[in-house]
Amino acid sequence: MYTSRWSKEARQTSFPTLAENITADVAVIGGGITGITTAYLLSQKGLRVALIDKARFGSGETSHTTAHLTYVTDTRLLELARVFGKERARLVWDAGRTAINEIARIVSAESIDCNWQIAAGYLHVPWLKRSEFANHRLDEEAALAQELGFAAQYVQAAPVVGRPAMMVPDQALFHPMQYLATLIDRVVARGGLLFENTEYSDIEENPQAVVAGDYRIRCKYVVIATHVPVAGKTGRLRALSFQSKLAPYSSYAVGAELPPDPAARAMFWDLNNPYNYLRVEARGENDYAIFGGKDHKTGQEAHPEHCYEELETLLAEILPQARVTDRWSGQVIETHDGLPYIGETSEGQFIATGFSGNGMTFGTLAARMACDAIADVENPWLEAFHPTRPAMLRAPWTYLKENFDYPRYLVKDYLAPKERDEIKTPTAGSGKVMHINGNRLAVYCNDAGEISACSAVCPHLGCLVRWNSAEQTWDCPCHGSRFGPEGKLMAGPAEKTLEPCTGEALDHLKEKQREASVLIRAE
């Protein structure tokens, strides 16, 4: 499994697992940028906050970000204006601008050393295939941005890529893990209750409480900040209906060192679909570039290593002096109308998801919106991002397209001809789905050659998981749940681990491994 640059440089947190019943004003589920920022802002207001995460704080998608702080959304401004109207389009971009300003305020107020840098952003014609984008309309995009009050301009040749672009000057770069480490310290100093390796299991009502294992956090308000929202008080059926409006995509990134060049220090996003993105920042004596893209539905790429290889090849063309030092991938959640879902889903319960490629900005904005909801303060983005907002014209078609994966993979996996029991178990450091005694098993062999197995059936809605060779995870192709090599839940919408394989089935599997070893030696 690859590790992001942020994770390599992060300060390791160490908080206890919840081991008693406690009481708080607000319980926050999920310790990424949304959850930690929410806890920080609420504790600043004097509220008693309990923050829990199923692993370590910041170890989820926040640590796999490429950390672009921008108000330029994945859905183009012209498209936002066409679908929602100019005022709603302005509100969406203003949300990102507000989030950047909020992070800047916190960095200054707390004197956070997080490599904060103001940088320009360029939405540009792609490095390759530029003839296909002759009618790019970037001049119109820039003109509309100016009309709506944003400092944008059209340029004939963006730095680094040398292509026509819309330039926005007031974006930013930072180190997300260093930033969040300080926020965590402040929450603790203000009496916050922080628990790691504490997995949510339910939300009770009357009185309200978050259940985690054998213990409860009694609270007046719950903020669900878990990338893909857990079921909460809405119930499983309503949760499944809501989760079906979310589409999980995997995105890949490579990090590289390169000689210092002040002109190159900026952010870049091309017009491809899926698009490639680049950010270059000063780091010590050198510059550091992060180049990403190659997005696909989670669990649906047979050879994820190829995604990294293709990115490295293209980066070498754009920045020939770049020396790749890091690889990592992350997951982004898309919605059917291109806007996030942020708001209350029932009384006393707030969710935030669907940030697409703007997780750092929308995550920060969601924290501010959660604080406003708890304080009963009017918020200008409430209607635009509300989870129950009406579907726009294009949304039903996008919904059908994104949800076709579920029946397609169910049919493919369960109606395919039955295979005989497989003999060869995975090689060291790999996994494969095997059919053993009529069971579909997710079989993993660690570097020491030890076999472990669990059910290959995703506990969310029953699809079969796939082995991700690049990240050493089991990924569900239907709704994007991800599991560790031995079946531990990493990301929802599933809320349980893959069921462990024990007893006769595991013994049978190990016997298969011994038989295969004998066959290999005989050959």
Predicted segments, located by residue:
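Flavin (FAD/FMN) cofactor-binding and adjacent substrate-gating region
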Residues: 1-8, 75-81, 102-182, 190
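Extreme N-terminal leader/targeting segments of oxidoreductases
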Residues: 1-26, 498-501, 506, 517-523
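N-terminal Rossmann-like FAD-binding beta1-loop-alpha1 element of flavoenzymes
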Residues: 24-51
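Glycine-rich FAD pyrophosphate-binding loop
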Residues: 44-64
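Helical element adjacent to the flavin cofactor pocket in flavoenzyme catalytic cores
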Residues: 144, 166-220
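Flavin-dependent oxidoreductases
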Residues: 202-280, 423-424
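Rieske [2Fe-2S] iron-sulfur-binding domain
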Residues: 254, 433-523
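C-terminal catalytic lobe of FAD-dependent flavoproteins
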Residues: 272-273, 297-399, 454
